[in-house]
Amino acid sequence: MKRKSIAPSKSPADPISPDPVSGVRDGDLPAYVSNGLVGLRIREVPLLAGVAIVNGFAGVHPERRIEAAAYVPYPLALDIGVGEAWLSHQPWAVDDLEQAYDFSTGELTSRFSLELMGNRLLVEVITLASRSHPALVLQETTIRSAKTAAIKLRAHVDPAGVRGRGARHRTATPGEDEPVCDGSLLWISEGNLSTCGIACVSRCESAEEGKSGGDWDWRGPLNTHYCVDAAANSEVRIQQIAALVPSVIHERPDEEAVRRVAEGARLGFQELRKLNQAEWKDLWRSRIVIEGARAEHQRLVDAAFFYLNSSVHTASPAATSIFGLASWPNYHYYYGHVMWDIEAFCVPPLIFFQPDAARSLLDFRRRGMEAAKSYARLFGRDGIQFPWEAAPLSGQEATPGAGSGAAHADHVSLHVARAFSLYAEVSGDQRFAAEVAWPVLAGVADWFCSRVTWTDRGAELRAATGPAEVPNPPDNDSFSQMAAHEVLGRAVRLGQFLGHRVPATWNAARSSLYLPRRSDGVIPSHDDFRANEEKGATPSPLAGIFPYDFPLSPESERPLWSSFWPDGRSISARRCCRRFIPCGQPWPATGTCPSSCSRKGTPNTTLPGSTSVSNTAWTIRTPPFQPGRSSPTSPACFQDCFSV
């Protein structure tokens, strides 16, 4: 695709959207539109079916035969016809392809021309996934005809290429004289692991003949037909709304999808679009602004913020995968499994951007507690051990094949426990801390103490890989040990705060953790580490410093940084310092945090109580903790200070 450069945003409230692209994708991936419950991969001709994923909908993977996220029929397909010529029959009649993604609203706009029966049609398509009504995805298509013509439209749910089967297909609404929507479909995944309900409604005001649906075959496609007598240079507009509900949320999901799409039809496309724009405007109040850096750095930060927030929602029943809900046949995308990256790197910022969504991610792990207990017992260990690759539906281990990562990458449980602790501390929700976070922290602490081997050197972690997955698991992965130091400390502090009797083994293990060191004092990645070994360049010990908080003196920290970046800038002080400061208490550099932090405050300015992260090159500013509609009370603010 060719890119058309655009100027960066001038308002601090406006993100930098990607440059518009033109032409065919070639090897590029299609656009990704998602709200955290429904994810779409949208082709450069968006009316042709792409890929649709629904959070929590799972099936048997066609190749690996494991539980995995599964495709559902594409809900926003549309065919355009003139006479006997249709877009779907001759897609090569398309030209002038353009796409633009507006990060400020989450809307994808696609344009193309289409030559049918000697008539040139100009087509514009707006596609979005509703954040205010997360079961809904929407599309508006505007067609301008160069000549007077009878334009045929066929809105349909396209199951082509999707493994699984339709179990129920309705175009009428039982007990109603008039159907409340165009129709509904109950889709069963391969392996019968779960079902998904899809309901759709469409509207084309200029269609003189009204609309007609195909109920000739209850197993057939769900489609609605229109015919419009369009004058030359006039516009024909069709709006489509589809609801998608997984069975993990509702046992009869097609019926619930009908109710959801009926509410969407009542509100209408434009109102839903306005509500979605308002949701994104609200989210962008938490935009991270880098002052003094080049525009491409801010562009990357905006893209990361957008895609992270696109991939999570309060309504997400199965957390999210490391690729969100973006899937395409070119790659396995880790089968939609939930892995340690989510708790280590996604939950902490989401506690501030979308606290309700962060809670939803943690709820997935909470629902998997029994599976984690059984998994620990399977290894002969105490407590709870979370799986390396958690299946989206069952929450159980689903690593394909021999599963070497599942057998030896034990650090995943530490990240999960830390994420629960962070949410409890930042939110100030004591009920969450006592009823939700404490069982997780206590279970992981018990597990870790049963996992280590006690030697004359201390508590050693034998045969455990860190972030660098290698065939032969080493002993005493330093990142895992540093993470355990923090998690055990958090478990002890929370237990004492709640008045529990903390097992002595937790403190004993924490104070006795064996951490390998070279003769020059540098902490290597693990025992017998060699820089030229497979994946030896992975700087995993640095992650023990940030985002983890392993205590090292500046004298010990400098050579550790230099061992990975010998030609880089020296670190003159501890790179990362993290503190929780309750609302209303003074901040070192920015004054006083307001007693009630809210997303409704003035965005993207040096707010009292905002985070100010500085080094010699640039400053990052973010607003303070911003509770959502159902966030816990008594929030606390979080500060990161960088010194380089």
Task: Give the label of every model feature segment.
Residues 151, 248-255, 287-291, 352, ...:
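Inter-helical turn/loop segments and adjacent helix faces that build the functional surface
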Residues 335-368, 418, 435, 481-485, ...:
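Active-site core of glycosidic bond-cleaving carbohydrate-active enzymes
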Residues 447-501:
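Acidic/histidine-rich catalytic neighborhood
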Residues 142, 302-309, 332-336, 340-351, ...:
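Contiguous, well-ordered alpha-helical segments that form the cores/surfaces of helical PPI scaffolds
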Residues 312-330, 356-418, 424, 431-435, ...:
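Helix-terminus loop motifs that line ligand-binding clefts
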